[in-house]
């Protein structure tokens, strides 16, 4: 990839094809990017680095995931009952 | 006196298939009564009927074979096929539970956090009690083979000792598993981990108990000198069943206890 992350974010239209999730059911695509956003943010802020690259994952999950799921997971994270490993 | 000109066993009319079928019907409908109408009567009656059926039917088979001589080598051959086919059906039964386990654990769903074991589940250490249980069952496989050879070599006392050891090991396994169940931090209603774990190991434990009972019946029969050194199919059937139980445990140990942790 010859684009920088800033360029990729600027040119973002919608979630691109992800070969890890080739089929019609994109649930895991949504969930994986949701997890990756929070993991990325946690890791980069722990290192004291600007978490801008994590924004990619946020864009993708916001494009893919149903809002109700995101709200549910956000609430679970706040209550400490989120099942994923962040 | 008319003789039969074939080696097959034409069994006398018997009520036990009917009572067995009736008890199976009452068991299933009794289960529904228990679930939906909070009534234990039907299922309780069906269990009594089932136990009576088993006792009397197998007693009759012993009478026909050991005392009346109806079990020619041809009859014994068909009994062997029967036991083998039954064990094959049991393999199919457990195959389903292993399928379920691998379905849930190979690609865990987002509801489980896409991880296995799921967050919050502390799996049992496979190298503590489960490893001991593996050694116990493997050892009991050795002792039951010793019992078989003692039987074939006409050393009655050795056979009684080695079969008793096998039974004691079976009971020891059951007690240890019971302790593990009591002391585990998760139960059957804790997500897919709990379901797969307890259904698979639970049915296995039930089969250990059945196998132990079968071996105990063989011990009692040996003490009453039912078996000869060349004709002892009841014992062989029990030993096959016991080896099957051991093999299922090995698969459980490797898949659920070890890989699944």
From Swiss-Prot, chain B:
EC number: 7.1.1.9
InterPro entries linked: Cyt_c/ubiquinol_Oxase_su3, Cyt_c_oxase_su3_dom, Cyt_c_oxidase-like_su3, Cyt_c_oxidase_su3-like_sf, Cyt_c_oxidase_su3_a-hlx
Intervals, Mitochondrial intermembrane compartment: 35-40, 106-128, 184-190, 257-261
One Gene Ontology term of the molecular function aspect: cytochrome-c oxidase activity
Keyword Metal-binding: no
Keywords associated with the record: Membrane, Mitochondrion, Mitochondrion inner membrane, Translocase, Transmembrane, Transmembrane helix
Taxonomic superkingdom: Eukaryota
Name of the top EC class for this enzyme: translocase
Membrane-spanning residues: 16-34, 41-66, 73-105, 129-152, 156-183, 191-223, 233-256
Subcellular location: Mitochondrion inner membrane
Membrane topology field: Multi-pass membrane protein
Subunit structure, as described in the record: Component of the cytochrome c oxidase (complex IV, CIV), a multisubunit enzyme composed of 14 subunits. The complex is composed of a catalytic core of 3 subunits MT-CO1, MT-CO2 and MT-CO3, encoded in the mitochondrial DNA, and 11 supernumerary subunits COX4I, COX5A, COX5B, COX6A, COX6B, COX6C, COX7A, COX7B, COX7C, COX8 and NDUFA4, which are encoded in the nuclear genome.
General function of this protein: Component of the cytochrome c oxidase, the last enzyme in the mitochondrial electron transport chain which drives oxidative phosphorylation. The respiratory chain contains 3 multisubunit complexes succinate dehydrogenase (complex II, CII), ubiquinol-cytochrome c oxidoreductase (cytochrome b-c1 complex, complex III, CIII) and cytochrome c oxidase (complex IV, CIV), that cooperate to transfer electrons derived from NADH and succinate to molecular oxygen, creating an electrochemical gradient over the inner membrane that drives transmembrane transport and the ATP synthase.
The protein's name: Cytochrome c oxidase subunit 3
Organism: Myxine glutinosa (Atlantic hagfish)
Gene expressing this chain: MT-CO3
């Amino acid at each position: 990839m010859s684009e920088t992350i800033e360029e990729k974010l600027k040119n973002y239209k919608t979630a691109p094809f992800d070969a890890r999730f080739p089929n019609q059911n994109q649930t895991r695509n949504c969930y994986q990017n949701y997890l990756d956003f929070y993991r990325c943010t946690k890791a980069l802020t722990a290192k004291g680095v600007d978490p801008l690259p994590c924004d990619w994952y946020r864009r993708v999950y916001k494009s893919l995931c149903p809002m109700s799921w995101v709200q549910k997971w956000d609430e679970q994270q706040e209550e400490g009952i989120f099942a994923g490993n962040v | 006196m008319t003789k039969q000109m074939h080696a097959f066993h034409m069994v006398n009319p018997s009520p036990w298939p009917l009572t067995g079928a009736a008890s199976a019907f009452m068991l299933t409908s009794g289960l529904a009564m228990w679930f939906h109408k909070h009534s234990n009567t039907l299922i309780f009656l069906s269990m009594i009927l089932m136990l009576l059926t088993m006792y009397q039917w197998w007693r009759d088979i012993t009478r026909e074979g050991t005392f009346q001589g109806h079990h020619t080598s041809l009859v014994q051959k068909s009994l062997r096929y029967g036991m083998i086919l039954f064990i094959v059906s049991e393999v199919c039964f457990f195959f389903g539970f292993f399928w379920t386990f691998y379905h849930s654990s190979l690609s865990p769903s987002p509801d489980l956090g896409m991880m296995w074991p799921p967050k919050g589940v502390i799996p049992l250490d496979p190298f503590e009690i489960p490893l001991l249980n593996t050694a116990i069952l493997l050892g009991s496989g050795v002792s039951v083979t010793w019992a078989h050879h003692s039987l074939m070599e006409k050393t009655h006392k050795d056979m009684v000792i080695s079969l008793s050891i096998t039974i004691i090991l079976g009971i020891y396994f059951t007690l240890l598993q019971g302790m593990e169940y009591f002391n585990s931090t998760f139960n059957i209603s804790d997500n897919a981990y709990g379901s797969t774990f307890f259904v698979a190991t639970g049915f296995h434990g039930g089969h250990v108990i059945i196998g132990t009972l079968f071996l105990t019946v063989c011990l009692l029969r040996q003490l009453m000198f039912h078996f000869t050194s060349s004709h002892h199919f009841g014992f062989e059937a029990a030993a096959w069943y016991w080896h099957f139980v051991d093999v299922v445990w090995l698969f459980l140990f490797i898949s659920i206890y070890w890989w699944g942790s």
